[in-house]
């Protein structure tokens, strides 16, 4: 059971944090997105929730689990993208490692997302990747990207060594311009965004109309076949190792 990895005190703290986000969205008439662990049955998910004026309006379970830090041993992967209409625009929601997989942000683009929100726990050692990937996703999908990263230190689940987290929250517009960044401390990063810039960029550079799904369909099928073959080979080797 995944739940043996976590204690009751942790889930109580998570519940308090979620209540705080809900209250914050109500008190300030805001849309708030935050991520934490979620228990359902015998499974634990890394889940982002979207609150609007004190109401939970959407949730997203992280699809891409971070295997280098053995996240897949402690959490179950989600299987449903999240795109939701809010008072501030149509949001696509990702979590941390998801940003490395362009297929998911592109799905949000297909579904008309205007803003991509990415809560993360991205370490200082790879902070350049965080900054570059957020900006790339904004440019290639012609939308705003809001990345929120943690600060402080925490031990790696895999090695036990402490990792530092730089904060480095940022707001990026559809042209790739960085509108605001954090300073490394816990706090708020703010910027005024104009959604008409999304429509303008998509008119000037009509990526949607120039897509070639007829080509991608076959390419994705080949990728799927290779991944399936690799998984079968890995399972076969594991079974052989167990017998020997």
Kindly label every feature range from the protein language model:
Residues 1-10:
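Short, conserved active-site loops that position catalytic residues or coordinate cofactors/metal ions
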Residues 14-33, 99-189:
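CN hydrolase (nitrilase-like) catalytic-core segments centered on the catalytic cysteine
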Residues 34-36, 47-50, 82, 169-171, ...:
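Short beta-strand scaffold segments in enzyme catalytic cores
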Residues 9, 59, 181:
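Conserved beta-strand positions that form and line the central face of beta-propeller blades
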Residues 38, 65-66, 152, 197:
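Active-site/binding-pocket entry motifs
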Residues 18, 32, 85-89, 111, ...:
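RNA-binding accessory domains that recognize and position tRNA/RNA substrates
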Residues 150-244:
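C-terminal beta-strand edge segments of enzyme domains
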Residues 12, 23, 39-111, 119-120, ...:
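Active-site catalytic loop in hydrolytic enzyme cores
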């Amino acid at each position: 059971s995944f739940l043996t990895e976590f204690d009751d005190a942790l889930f109580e703290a998570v519940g308090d944090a979620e209540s705080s986000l809900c209250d914050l969205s109500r008190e300030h008439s805001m849309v708030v997105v935050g991520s934490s662990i979620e228990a359902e049955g015998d499974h634990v998910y890394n889940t982002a929730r979207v609150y609007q004026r004190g109401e939970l309006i959407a949730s997203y379970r992280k699809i891409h689990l971070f295997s280098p830090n053995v996240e897949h041993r402690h959490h179950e992967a989600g299987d449903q993208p999240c795109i939701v209409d809010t008072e501030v625009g149509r949001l696509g929601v990702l979590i941390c490692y998801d940003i490395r997989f362009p297929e998911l942000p592109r799905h949000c683009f297909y579904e008309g997302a205007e803003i991509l929100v990415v809560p993360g726990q991205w370490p200082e050692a790879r902070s350049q990747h965080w900054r570059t990937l957020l900006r790339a996703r904004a440019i290639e999908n012609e939308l705003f990207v809001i990345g929120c990263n943690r600060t402080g230190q925490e031990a790696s689940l895999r090695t036990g060594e402490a990792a530092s987290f730089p904060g480095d929250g940022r707001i990026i517009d559809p042209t790739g311009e960085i509108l605001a960044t954090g300073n490394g401390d816990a706090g708020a990063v703010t910027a005024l965004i104009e959604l008409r810039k999304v429509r303008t960029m998509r008119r000037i550079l009509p990526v949607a109309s120039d897509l070639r799904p007829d080509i991608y369909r076959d390419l994705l099928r080949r990728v799927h076949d290779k991944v399936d073959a690799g998984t079968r080979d890995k399972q076969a080797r594991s079974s052989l190792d167990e017998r020997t």
